[in-house]
Amino acid sequence: MALNKEDKKDIFLTYSAKNVAQDTGSPESQIALFSNRITYLTEHLKQYPKDKASRLGLIKLVGKRKKQLTYLQNTAIERYRDIIVKLGIRK
């Protein structure tokens, strides 16, 4: 599951506010990384529905992403709307 450096750089370039690969701390980058991991875990749980540890990890990731989205919504509403559209997240 672990993303290699190139995949992470692609995610950061695509979704970061500054469009640089080193922008790992921006909320957009964090949300995109969480979304990637959530997608992977969702597919994993479809194949292995009894994997309770992965289910717990998925629930925690969704909570972390939700907190980041709330922060972004309260601080920069336009950036929030852009990332929601780019990632296709329903809110």
UniProtKB/Swiss-Prot annotation:
Instruction: List the GO terms this entry assigns under cellular component, sorted alphabetically.
Output: cytosolic small ribosomal subunit
GO biological process, alphabetically ordered: translation
Query: Which SUPFAM superfamilies does the record match to this protein?
Result: S15/NS1 RNA-binding domain
Q: Which GO terms describe its molecular function?
A: rRNA binding; structural constituent of ribosome
Q: Which CDD domains match?
A: Ribosomal_S15p_S13e
Annotated keywords: Ribonucleoprotein, Ribosomal protein, RNA-binding, rRNA-binding
Q: Which domain of life is it from?
A: Bacteria
Does the UniProt entry include the keyword RNA-binding? Answer: yes
What InterPro entries would the database entry show?
Answer: Ribosomal_uS15, Ribosomal_uS15_bac-type, uS15_NS1_RNA-bd_sf
Entry-linked Gene3D superfamilies:
6.10.250.3130, S15/NS1, RNA-binding
Looking at the keywords, is Protease present? no
Family membership: Belongs to the universal ribosomal protein uS15 family.
| Described function | One of the primary rRNA binding proteins, it binds directly to 16S rRNA where it helps nucleate assembly of the platform of the 30S subunit by binding and bridging several RNA helices of the 16S rRNA. Forms an intersubunit bridge (bridge B4) with the 23S rRNA of the 50S subunit in the ribosome.
How does this polypeptide assemble, per the annotation? Part of the 30S ribosomal subunit. Forms a bridge to the 50S subunit in the 70S ribosome, contacting the 23S rRNA.
PANTHER family associated with the record: RIBOSOMAL PROTEIN S15, BACTERIAL AND ORGANELLAR, SMALL RIBOSOMAL SUBUNIT PROTEIN US15M
Know the name of this protein? Answer: Small ribosomal subunit protein uS15
Q: Which organism is it from?
A: Amoebophilus asiaticus (strain 5a2)
Q: Which gene encodes it?
A: rpsO
